[in-house]
């Protein structure tokens, strides 16, 4: 069992948690992920590590409540326990041998972009960060990003905060200004990563995307996390989660990732309704 030692709501749908997991914290690196189960009957859900403290033995996760398991996890509080917390899994983000990079994060994907940006900065790499959100109300980790990079560009789709436009607008501007990036790392919704890769391709800039496909065991045995990269089948849990953004088959990835979306939403809705009904019964 793994204890929740800290919980913070970052916005209405996104939650930050620190889990007491000393063995995971000891080995964790930016870009890797864990798999959790809330209880014995729960599904196994992968989440990218959002931070870690080796001295305290804690691992941070940031998640959006989209299905039953994340809704159940979000209903727990500090001092509660979860059944499983396995990791670190996957290959860490490669921060070596680079002079300047640009990390691009979208929405809740910024939770994953943050530790990678921090790792680049700590490795002595000049780090630009572009983060994008739909509006001001869902902006997360702004102060943390300011400490983890050399230049931060915050974009909102509606212009309610930061600069108006998508992350690709700012990326295009930076590339056209003549900045020479050794790498662009994109983390977020699949369409965003796809268009970031399309933006960088004419400039010949190496682009890496962090993928989070459907996953079950996290060891490559189930095949659920398979993705097509450069015409070859790869497994995100062992070959990734970072891949060459110019070679990923995004259309296939989007199709596979959407298979259970409606069911996840329905399960979450049922769970919320059940809890509300139980609360009403207790009040009576």
Predicted regions and their residues:
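Ferredoxin-reductase
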Residues: 1-78
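Structural signal for conserved beta-strand scaffold positions within catalytic alpha/beta enzyme cores
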Residues: 6, 51, 154-156, 209, ...
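A generic structural signal for residues embedded in beta-strands
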Residues: 36, 84-85, 227
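Short, Lys/Arg- and Gly-enriched loop/turn segments at beta-strand edges
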Residues: 42-51, 89-99, 237
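FNR/FR-type flavoprotein reductase catalytic core
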Residues: 71-214
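Local cysteine-cluster metal-coordination motifs and their immediate loop/turn environment
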Residues: 112, 190-191, 212-242, 271-275
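Short Fe-S-cluster ligation motifs
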Residues: 235-239, 243-284
């Amino acid at each position: 069992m793994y204890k929740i030692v800290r919980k913070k709501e970052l916005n209405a749908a996104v939650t930050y948690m620190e889990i007491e997991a000393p063995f995971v914290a000891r080995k964790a690196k930016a870009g890797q992920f864990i798999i959790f189960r809330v209880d014995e009957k729960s599904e196994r859900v992968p989440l990218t590590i959002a931070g870690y403290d080796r001295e305290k033995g804690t691992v941070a996760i940031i998640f959006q409540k989209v299905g039953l398991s994340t809704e159940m996890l979000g209903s727990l509080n500090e001092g509660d326990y979860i059944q499983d917390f396995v990791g670190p899994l996957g290959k860490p983000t490669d921060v070596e041998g680079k002079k300047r990079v640009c990390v691009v994060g979208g929405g809740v994907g910024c939770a994953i972009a943050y530790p990678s940006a921090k790792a680049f900065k700590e490795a002595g790499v000049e780090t630009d960060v572009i983060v994008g959100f739909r509006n001001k109300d869902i902006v997360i980790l702004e102060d943390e990003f300011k400490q983890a990079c050399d230049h931060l560009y915050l974009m909102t789709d509606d212009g309610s905060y930061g600069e108006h436009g998508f992350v690709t607008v700012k990326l295009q501007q930076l590339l056209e200004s003549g900045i020479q990036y050794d790498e662009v790392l994109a983390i977020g919704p699949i369409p965003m990563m796809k268009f970031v890769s399309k933006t960088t391709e004419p400039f010949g800039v190496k682009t890496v995307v962090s993928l989070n496909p459907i996953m079950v065991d996290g060891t490559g045995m189930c095949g659920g996390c398979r993705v097509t990269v450069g015409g070859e089948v790869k497994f995100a849990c062992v070959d990734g989660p970072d891949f060459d953004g110019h070679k990923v088959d995004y259309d296939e990835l989007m199709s596979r990732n959407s298979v259970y979306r409606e069911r996840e939403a329905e399960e979450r809705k049922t769970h919320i309704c059940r809890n509300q009904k139980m609360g009403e019964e207790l009040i009576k």
